[in-house]
Amino acid sequence: MQMNSVWKLSLGLLLLSSVIGSFAELDFGHCETLVKKWADSSSSREEHVNKDKRSLKDLLFFLHVPRTGGRTYFHCFLRKLYDSSEECPRSYDKLHFNPRKEKCKLLATHDDYSLMAKLPRERTSVMTIVRDPIARVLSTYEFSVEVAARFLVHPNLTSASRMSSRIRKSNVISTLDIWPWKYLVPWMREDLFARRDARKLKEVVIIEDDNPYDMEEMLMPLHKYLDAPTAHDIIHNGATFQIAGLTNNSHLSEAHEVRHCVQKFKSLGESVLQVAKRRLDSMLYVGLTEEHRESASLFANVVGSQVLSQVVPSNATAKIKALKSEASVTISETGSDKSNIQNGTSEVTLNKAEAKSGNMTVKTLMEVYEGCITHLRKSQGTRRVNSLKRITPANFTRGTRTRVPKEVIQQIKSLNNLDVELYKYAKVIFAKEHELVSNKLISSSKRSIVDLPSELKSVLGEMGEEKLWKFVPVALMLLLIVLFFLFVNAKRRRTSKVKI
């Protein structure tokens, strides 16, 4: 009798495991079909779009992946090239205008690629910047802490939340209005207040570790941040999902389910990765955060030159803005000391000194950019210092990133496996475009000597490009010396004739 009961129990467990297994198999099968259907649909929509990807279309869509340096590009490049009247209404969270009716030329947003479904594809060029996934994730963590720490000027979380919602200004974009910070900052803010309250209950708080990424008494440790559901949904593989159009801010109805399937079954991620790669291939410009100077130069020559060429100069209405290199940046600090204790968000307004000119060149654009980023970085540095002093001794610098344990770095790589591959692919695209532009510039420099005497052209033609550029200053100096002697000699002849 006992053996019969054991046999029945075993049979029941076997049937149960079989049912569970079949459900899991059905779940995978459903996900596989769903992801494949989405990938096929995405590919077919883009088959005949952007055949001439290197030509700037009527609308430039800057797909801004968070923490890649896109804010610098927007303020120090794009706002110098486009007049404010040419900017589309801000769409940091959702689309706030009808793109088929508006005649704007620049759309810069944290929206993902799904926004393209609402834009006139045949008249839209896309650009983006990609960053090393490890650096991007660390920067996301640091910025979440930095912005959330600004709220600690308030006595408690209720006060901070009430004040920030009350002071929202309609004409200024707040960090809490922007995806993904509208999710990440409140999450970190709540954690910082909870830890501060816990410290107040203790008579003495001893912080033994000076590693800001593992300072549990002050803030959420990095390894816990990485494992949280919010991080899995928004941060990990964030660049791939954003370029694929599958974030939790997507305009696609199926985005959540597709993303969930890929997160649950890693093998399905390859389909999403391939879609993201094809979209990078079709873009007008792909920059790299780590190759800052080269990326800026490439942007100026690929995008900037085309925007400049479309401008028709006129005395009163030229639209190219040769801004002074010291762009005036006004920052309303989040919870800054005394004078600016207003709310828990960072609000940035650029007061542009506009000197309209139709004579701006790629060279002057780069000069303006260099001056602008120097000022902008200084302002950002000041803001960070003021924020992080509220959670002293925690502080983030380039040097402190070396304190992150190797196993945590490996964890970031594993959780961002799609982004790792996408970044590798972006580097290949960047290298090809950089070489192409460099060759065009060399060809242009060769054409500039067409009008020289044939003997001199022959000599220069045999010289290498590097030697050629070294030769130019010397040649100019020799030419000036010859002209000087000719001038002196002519003067002497005139003097001799007068004496006779």
From Swiss-Prot:
Segments in the Cytoplasmic topological domain: 489-500
Organism domain of life: Eukaryota
GO cellular component, one term: Golgi membrane
Catalytic reaction(s) noted: L-tyrosyl-[protein] + 3'-phosphoadenylyl sulfate = O-sulfo-L-tyrosine-[protein] + adenosine 3',5'-bisphosphate + H(+)
Molecular-function GO terms, alphabetical: protein-tyrosine sulfotransferase activity
Protein name: Protein-tyrosine sulfotransferase
Membrane disposition: Single-pass type I membrane protein
Main location as per UniProt: Golgi
Active site, UniProt feature: R121, E142
KW Ligase (keyword) present: no
Any Pfam family matching the protein: Sulfotransfer_2
Organism: Arabidopsis thaliana
Annotated signal peptide: 1-24
EC class (word): transferase
Gene name of the record: TPST
